[in-house]
C-alpha cells in the first residue's frame, strides 16, 4: 500500500505544479481535467499529511518516555496517536479502492411511469420532488428538461439535469425500479395499490467524450407544451433531437425547458450524447459479463431496488440487509436520502475491500 500512496502523493504534487502554471489556462479541457484530479487526490493527500504529523509526534513522545516527569503525558500521547494511526490506515485503504470515474460528472435523470396507470404518474412527480430536495440539500441544481404531464398532476415521463460537484456519485444508486404501495386518492374502498416507476441515472457526456455525427441527427422545433397539451409560449422554442431516426438505433430527446431555441438545442444534444455514451457503456458491460460468464446484479435497470410503503411509513432498499435496509418514509420523501445512500456506499466499499483482500491472498499464494 505504501508504494501506491507514494505514487499518488507524487502525482498530486505534479498536478498542483501544473495548476500553478499560467499556461494551463490556455487549454480549458486540460485545466478541467487537472482540477478534477486535484479534487480526487486531495482527501488522500490530506490524510497522508495527517499521518506524517502523527508519526512525528509519536517519535517525540517516545523520546520523552525516559523522563519520569513526562512519562505519563507521553504515554497518553502515544496511546492516542497509535489509535488514530490505525484509523488512518483503514481510511487510506478505503481511498485506495477503485473509484468511479463518472462520480464528478453531472447527471441526466429520467423518471418513467411503469405499472399502475395514473397512480404511477403521480409517484413520478413525488420522486421528482424528493430528488429536488435531496439535490438542494447537497448543493446541487436540478433543472427539468422535459415533462410529459397529465391533468391529474402526474407525469408519464420526466427528464432532468442535475449539475454540481459529485452529482453522479450522489444519484447513481437511484437507477432501477422503484415500487410504491399506498391507497390512491381515487380509491373509495381503501385498498392498497402497487405501482412502479423506472429511474435511469446517466452521467452527462462531456465535450469530446462521444463523437456525435450531426448528419445522423434530425432536429425538429415546435412550441412548448404544458399539462394537458396547453401551449406555454407562442414561439417554436422546444427542440426534438432524433438520432438515426427510423432505425433500431433510434434515440429521441425532447428539450422544452428554456425559452431559447438555441439553448434547448444545445441541451438536447448533450442529453443525446449522454444516452449514446450510456448505450456504449452498457454494450461494453454486457460483453464483459459474457466474457467472465457472470451477471452482476447491481447494474441491471430492471431490478426492483426499493419499496415505498405508505401505510407503514417505511422505505425498504432491497440491496441492503439488516437494520440498514429500512428507513422512515416521511424523511426520505422530504429529501432525506442521505442515510440510504451512505448505507449503499458503505456496503459497496466493504465488498471492494473483501475483493481486494481476496486478490492479495491469491497473489500471496502464487
Curated annotation (Swiss-Prot):
<dbReference type="InterPro" id="IPR000352">
    <property type="entry name" value="Pep_chain_release_fac_I"/>
</dbReference>
<dbReference type="InterPro" id="IPR005139">
    <property type="entry name" value="PCRF"/>
</dbReference>
<feature type="compositionally biased region" description="Basic and acidic residues">
    <location>
        <begin position="283"/>
        <end position="293"/>
    </location>
</feature>
<dbReference type="InterPro" id="IPR045853">
    <property type="entry name" value="Pep_chain_release_fac_I_sf"/>
</dbReference>
<protein>
    <recommendedName>
        <fullName>Peptide chain release factor 1</fullName>
    </recommendedName>
</protein>
<keyword id="KW-0648">Protein biosynthesis</keyword>
<comment type="similarity">
    <text>Belongs to the prokaryotic/mitochondrial release factor family.</text>
</comment>
<dbReference type="InterPro" id="IPR050057">
    <property type="entry name" value="Prokaryotic/Mito_RF"/>
</dbReference>
<dbReference type="GO" id="GO:0016149">
    <property type="term" value="F:translation release factor activity, codon specific"/>
</dbReference>
<dbReference type="Pfam" id="PF03462">
    <property type="entry name" value="PCRF"/>
</dbReference>
<dbReference type="Pfam" id="PF00472">
    <property type="entry name" value="RF-1"/>
</dbReference>
<feature type="compositionally biased region" description="Basic and acidic residues">
    <location>
        <begin position="315"/>
        <end position="328"/>
    </location>
</feature>
<dbReference type="InterPro" id="IPR004373">
    <property type="entry name" value="RF-1"/>
</dbReference>
<comment type="function">
    <text>Peptide chain release factor 1 directs the termination of translation in response to the peptide chain termination codons UAG and UAA.</text>
</comment>
<feature type="region of interest" description="Disordered">
    <location>
        <begin position="283"/>
        <end position="335"/>
    </location>
</feature>
<keyword id="KW-0488">Methylation</keyword>
<feature type="modified residue" description="N5-methylglutamine">
    <location>
        <position position="230"/>
    </location>
</feature>
<keyword id="KW-0963">Cytoplasm</keyword>
<dbReference type="GO" id="GO:0005737">
    <property type="term" value="C:cytoplasm"/>
</dbReference>
Amino acid at each position: 500500500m505504501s508504494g501506491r500512496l507514494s505514487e499518488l502523493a507524487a502525482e498530486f504534487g505534479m498536478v498542483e505544479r501544473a495548476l500553478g502554471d499560467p499556461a494551463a489556462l490556455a487549454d480549458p479541457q486540460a485545466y478541467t481535467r487537472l482540477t478534477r484530479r486535484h479534487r480526487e487526490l486531495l482527501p488522500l493527500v490530506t490524510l497522508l499529511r495527517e499521518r506524517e504529523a502523527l508519526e512525528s509526534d509519536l517519535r517525540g513522545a517516545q523520546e520523552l518516555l525516559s523522563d519520569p516527569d513526562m512519562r505519563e503525558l507521553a504515554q497518553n500521547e502515544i496511546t492516542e496517536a497509535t489509535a488514530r494511526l490505525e484509523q488512518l490506515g483503514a481510511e487510506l485503504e478505503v481511498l485506495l479502492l477503485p473509484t468511479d470515474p463518472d462520480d464528478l460528472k453531472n447527471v441526466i435523470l429520467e423518471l418513467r411511469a411503469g405499472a399502475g396507470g395514473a397512480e404511477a404518474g403521480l409517484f413520478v412527480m413525488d420522486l421528482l420532488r424528493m430528488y429536488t430536495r435531496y439535490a438542494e440539500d447537497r448543493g446541487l441544481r436540478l433543472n427539468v428538461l422535459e415533462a410529459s404531464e397529465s391533468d391529474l398532476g402526474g407525469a408519464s415521463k420526466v427528464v432532468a439535469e442535475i449539475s454540481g460537484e459529485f452529482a453522479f456519485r450522489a444519484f447513481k444508486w437511484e437507477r432501477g425500479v422503484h415500487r410504491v404501495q399506498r391507497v390512491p386518492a381515487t380509491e373509495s374502498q381503501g385498498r392498497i395499490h402497487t405501482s412502479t416507476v423506472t429511474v435511469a441515472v446517466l452521467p452527462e457526456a462531456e465535450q469530446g467524450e462521444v463523437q456525435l455525427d450531426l448528419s445522423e441527427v434530425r432536429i425538429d422545433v415546435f412550441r412548448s407544451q404544458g399539462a394537458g397539451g396547453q401551449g406555454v409560449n407562442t414561439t417554436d422554442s422546444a427542440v426534438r433531437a432524433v438520432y438515426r431516426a427510423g432505425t433500431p438505433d433510434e434515440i429521441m430527446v425532447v428539450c422544452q425547458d428554456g425559452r431559447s431555441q438555441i439553448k434547448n438545442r444545445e441541451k438536447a444534444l448533450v442529453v443525446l450524447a449522454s444516452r449514446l455514451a450510456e448505450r456504449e457503456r452498457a454494450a461494453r458491460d454486457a460483453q464483459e459479463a459474457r466474457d467472465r460468464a457472470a451477471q452482476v446484479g447491481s447494474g441491471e435497470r430492471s431490478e426492483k431496488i426499493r419499496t415505498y410503503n405508505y401505510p407503514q411509513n417505511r422505505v425498504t432498499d432491497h440491496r441492503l440487509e439488516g437494520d440498514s435496509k429500512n428507513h422512515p418514509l416521511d424523511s426520505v420523501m422530504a429529501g432525506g436520502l442521505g442515510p440510504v445512500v451512505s448505507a449503499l456506499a458503505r456496503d459497496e466499499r466493504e465488498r471492494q475491500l473483501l475483493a481486494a483482500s481476496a486478490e492479495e491472498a491469491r497473489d500471496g499464494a502464487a
